[in-house]
Amino acid sequence: MKEHHIPKNSIITVAGTVGVGKSTLTKTLAKRLGFKTSLEEVDHNPYLEKFYHDFERWSFHLQIYFLAERFKEQKTIFEAGGGFVQDRSIYEDTGIFAKMHADKGTMSKVDYKTYTSLFEAMVMTPYFPHPDVLIYLEGDLENILNRIEQRGREMELQTSRSYWEEMHTRYENWISGFNACPVLKLRIEDYDLLNDENSIENIVDQIASVIHDNQKK
């Protein structure tokens, strides 16, 4: 295993749509670097299953819950001095999910305004620790849908294809304008963490390059 040049206090965040493989990369990368993980706790979310059954009723509750949980995670990461790989970014909540439901009318304008005001007060400040790099996982929609089906979460399988199509499009639009921190784009078709040990080494090299280039600015 060759030496990497990623600072031990780095914060690396993995972003991308549902089913794209964020958790797998987060765990594999953290193990390779000797970092801690910050994982999305799907099973303990009191609103998620209710949300999938009734978007309009539960979208605001769910987004406030996510915002609070992710902010607490950021605080933990900051207080620990970094050295974390994080599954999903706090930026996706407002840039993708809350905005999508506001646009579709499944979150009221008042709730959306309240949510975005809270997000900006908590996150978009100089005091908030932004990641050293955001890894954006992208891939063909059909491959992502196959992964969702193979994962077999009932609440995801009951969700319409049109929902996943719209989310896929919104993610692509969102990342094109994202500038809160440096971005590394990876296509899921280009690596296989489960069957190819060299895949993670190539990813580590790319992360080190992005962080190094940003430090020179």
Curated annotation (Swiss-Prot):
SUPFAM superfamilies: P-loop containing nucleoside triphosphate hydrolases. It comes from Bacillus subtilis (strain 168). Optimum pH is around pH 8.6. At pH 8.0-9.6 more than 90% of maximal activity is still observed. The active site is at residue 87. Deoxyadenosine inhibits deoxycytidine phosphorylation and deoxycytidine inhibits deoxyadenosine phosphorylation. Deoxyadenosine/deoxycytidine kinase is inhibited by both dATP and dCTP. ATP binds at residues 16-24. It comes from the Bacteria. The lineage of its organism: Bacteria, Bacillati, Bacillota, Bacilli, Bacillales. Keywords: ATP-binding, Kinase, Nucleotide-binding, Transferase. Belongs to the DCK/DGK family. Its EC number is 2.7.1.74, 2.7.1.76. One of its GO terms (molecular function) is deoxyadenosine kinase activity. It catalyses: 2'-deoxyadenosine + ATP = dAMP + ADP + H(+); 2'-deoxycytidine + a ribonucleoside 5'-triphosphate = dCMP + a ribonucleoside 5'-diphosphate + H(+). Plays an essential role in generating the deoxyribonucleotide precursors dATP and dCTP for DNA metabolism. The phosphate acceptor specificity is strict toward deoxyadenosine (dAdo) and deoxycytidine (dCyd). The specificity toward the sugar moiety of the nucleoside is less strict. Both 2-deoxyribose, ribose, and arabinose nucleosides are phosphorylated, although the 2-deoxyribonucleosides are preferred. The phosphate donor specificity is dependent on the deoxyribonucleoside substrate, but GTP is efficient with both deoxycytidine and deoxyadenosine. One of its GO terms (cellular component) is cytoplasm. This is Deoxyadenosine/deoxycytidine kinase. InterPro entries: DCK/DGK, Deoxyribonucleoside_kinase, DNK_dom, P-loop_NTPase.
